[in-house]
Amino acid sequence: VLPVINLIDDLYQRGIEKRKIEVVTDKRGSQYFKDRDIDVHSIDIYRSKTGMVGYMLNFQKMIKSIRLIEKKIDLKNCGILFTTGSYIAPLAGYLSWRHKIKFFIQEQNIYAGLGNKIASYFKSDKFTSYPNTININQKNLDNTGPIIDKKIQNNKSINNKEITIGVQGGSQGSEEINSLIYKYLGNNTLKNIKIIHIVGPNNFDNSKKFENYKQVEFIKDMTDFYSSIDLQVSRAGGGVLEAALINIPLLLIPYKHGTTSTHQSMNAEYLVKSKFAKLCSNYETLEYEFKKLEQLDKSLFEEFSKNNVIKIGNDSIVNKIIDEINK
């Protein structure tokens, strides 16, 4: 959802009228658009939990989802369909073929998810966040870099008195990453480090009250968050590139279950090899790094590369969309 919001913001700035943009998402995704003057259609779209087999066995549910979308959007007058993947991507691909609409796909991970993999075999232009993305049709594939909020920046300089760690525990698998932080807080006292912990919707726990620890369910504008932290602890999903782009070092705890584990482990491998991140595969590794920081040991920061090779994809993707609109 966030790449779509960032893309829409850039399209507005380039003169594309809001009335020309419509969003199809689910109930959870629609919450991100509450304060935006844009047409958002919340639709209960079929989601396969068993990969390709699930789509094949539930063909009627997919047809129902397609018909719901066709009722909500005037596809006869639609010039572009854009998807960022997940369960809606195959439907977007089919609709682009059926209604002869220009189709764009954006893949946020180095190992494409099943949705984008299926969608990529429909006629389309594909944009990737990571170089050498696999598990996707390589035809018309362009490594543009990620779509980010271009307002973000990291103005914080590391001082000798306190190190601020931002924890993003609000994504898939948040229970594990949150529990690791709680375990550390239960076993240790925060003196020279401060933790800002995003726990995710409905995960706020009033019992977790510690010195130098702040807990929030959700941060809508990440600009302030990134400007406040020296280091980030998070999963290794596509959104992690945002922190890497502004040279915030990463301690990564990849999600270990289901198909998501593949793309997160590969994302993490790329970021570690590029010296943007270190891997924390268990509690002991995380505790070791935190305790070093408690001693104001800055050697961790010296290990990370400042030679940022990651591109920002916003302008390249927006230009292609506008070129298509102007045809």
Residue ranges and their predicted role:
Residues 1-198, 202-327:
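Nucleotide-activated sugar donor-binding and catalytic core shared by glycosyltransferases
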